[in-house]
Amino acid sequence: MAVATSFALPNYSGMLFVKGKHRTPFSTLIGARPMQTNHVEFAVGQTYDAPIGSQPEISETASLTAPEPSFVTRTQNTNVTQIFQETVAVSYGKMSNMGTLSGLNAANQEANPADELAFQIARTMEKIAMQVEYTLINGVYVKANADNVANKTRGILAAIPNSNTIDLQSTPQAPVALTYDTVAEALALIHDQGGDTTDIILGVNATTLLQLNWDARKNNMTIVPASRNVNGLAIDTVITALGTVAVTLIDSLPDGTALLFNPTVCAPVFQPVPEKGNFFLEPLAKTGAADKYQIFGQLGLDHGPSFYHAKITGITTKKPSELSE
């Protein structure tokens, strides 16, 4: 276990800036209605097949005898929570040595942060938040059958069936950029399966967003910046042939993949520990001159009916400047 010590973590002065991708938009967008469970497996809903429209052919004579009864079967869909756990340890020597500064310093400057333990705990919570964001999107489902097997929650991408997937890699023109026509086709898949396209959000990475803006300019489409607010997150909107779609950056998506999801049917599912809560900070037994804590939590994804979402894969990873007109 790595313990924060004086020489391992020198003290510096100056403003602190986080480097790298650290935002969690998917977790934010589905966080309006968090759920709670006391069981590792939980239901994400039931589905049944809608009846197919047809014209009956019943004569007056045939109507004298009632037809055979029929029934509709239902299927339950489930997911699981999984454990997120990290440990933080800072030595007594490090905590008592915050006045020793390394690097370039001016007179009267102080170490930033001033409290190493608080800083390490906060950064560890950021790490867990990024683990949660990645897992809710990319998680591969595993239901444990023994104590030494880890439960793994099913992410939104794995939940989406092939019937709601467009693979651009299989097109004759591959590899191709993402266009709003393709987005409209994905909306059509959701519609044809019986899903609601009213609140759909399109999640893309930075390269794919540039491709969409490039396509919009070529076709005189209008992207309205920050015109919609979902759970405090301002997102852009664009009008397609099948309705208005919100567009937002989601950095945890795999390269070449775009996600259309309905946040109104998704939710994080927490499994709190009695009398402790969830994602709590707890001191661990001392083995020497250091303070040691663990952060523990259990969480899974309620992705709702899978046909309410869609994904587009096989998108080129080239920026518009690298694509031919």
PLM regions: where:
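Flexible, glycine/threonine- and acidic-rich loop/arm segments that mediate assembly and lattice contacts
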Residues: 1-244, 251-254, 263-325
